[in-house]
């Protein structure tokens, strides 16, 4: 069979044969097979051209996706799947890109963790979850995480949390809030506890007293409509204790308030 036309169509080329067959191919395919108008090709050669054209198109799509930022093998695979590239072609493309180091899950994990230590606020547990969602194996994740020390980051995040909540919460509630926030961000309990112990917390008794009475006003408005006497006092004590206030401070405030 003979090639009757090779015409550029945006990023692809339209190849027509004298038996009316048409197919879209990449520029790489033209170069690889040295295709030109009037060239005779066999059925076997046509099959090879079609296979390579699909591979080349898939690879070009993947490289386009990778041109914006580093990505994992799973992310590239998902992108190619969305563009209807056949599974066997995707496998070939991924193998080729891994060989040329365009895709490197270990390098991705290392950069991801390093970037978080420099500008992020997440601990190892959250990072492990995020990297796992991106298709990186648990072995690679664990090995890369073991190369980093999260102490400095834990301390930095704890200090930010202290600044955010110190004047808004009583001492006990402040401790609970900082510890829980650190754990939610992926730090271990021991890391969170150590970071909290390193904080320089200045007790502002006047502010603590102000917070207590403000909360007492709020709880009194809530419970005084239904309770009085001993029941009201008990309700207020329980409510304030749940908010993290010390029982002796609560008792003292209630003596003045009621």
Curated annotation (Swiss-Prot):
Cellular component GO terms held in the UniProt record: cytoplasm
RNA-binding is among the record's keywords: no
InterPro entries linked: RecX_HTH_1st (IPR053926), RecX_HTH_2nd (IPR053924), RecX_HTH_3rd (IPR053925), Regulatory_RecX (IPR003783), WH-like_DNA-bd_sf (IPR036388)
Gene Ontology biological-process entries: regulation of DNA repair
Gene3D superfamilies: Winged helix-like DNA-binding domain superfamily/Winged helix DNA-binding domain (1.10.10.10)
Keywords (A to Z) from UniProt: Cytoplasm
Superkingdom in the source lineage: Bacteria
Subcellular location: Cytoplasm
Record-linked NCBIfam families: PRK14135.1
Family: Belongs to the RecX family.
The protein's role, per its UniProt record: Modulates RecA activity.
Descriptive protein name: Regulatory protein RecX
């Amino acid at each position: 069979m003979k090639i009757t036309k090779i015409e550029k169509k945006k990023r692809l080329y339209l190849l027509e044969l004298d038996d009316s067959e048409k197919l879209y191919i990449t520029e790489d395919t033209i170069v690889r097979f040295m295709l030109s108008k009037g060239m005779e090709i066999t059925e076997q050669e046509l099959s090879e051209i079609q296979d390579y054209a699909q591979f080349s198109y898939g690879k070009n799509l993947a490289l386009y996706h990778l041109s914006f930022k580093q990505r994992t093998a799973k992310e590239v695979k998902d992108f190619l799947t969305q563009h209807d590239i056949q599974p066997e072609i995707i496998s070939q493309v991924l193998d080729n890109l891994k060989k040329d180091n365009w895709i490197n899950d270990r390098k991705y994990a290392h950069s991801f963790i390093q970037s978080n230590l420099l500008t992020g606020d997440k601990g190892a547990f959250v990072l492990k979850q995020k990297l796992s969602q991106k298709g990186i194996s648990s072995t690679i994740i664990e090995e890369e995480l073991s190369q980093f020390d999260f102490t400095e980051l834990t301390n930095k995040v704890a200090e930010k949390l202290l600044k955010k909540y110190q004047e808004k919460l009583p001492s006990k509630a402040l401790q609970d809030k900082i510890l829980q926030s650190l754990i939610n961000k992926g730090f271990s309990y021991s890391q969170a506890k150590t970071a909290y112990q390193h904080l320089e917390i200045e007790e502002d008794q006047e502010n603590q007293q102000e917070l207590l009475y403000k909360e007492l006003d709020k709880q009194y408005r809530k419970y005084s409509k239904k309770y009085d006497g001993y029941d009201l006092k008990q309700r207020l004590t329980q409510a304030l204790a749940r908010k993290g206030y010390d029982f002796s401070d609560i008792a003292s405030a209630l003596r003045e308030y009621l």
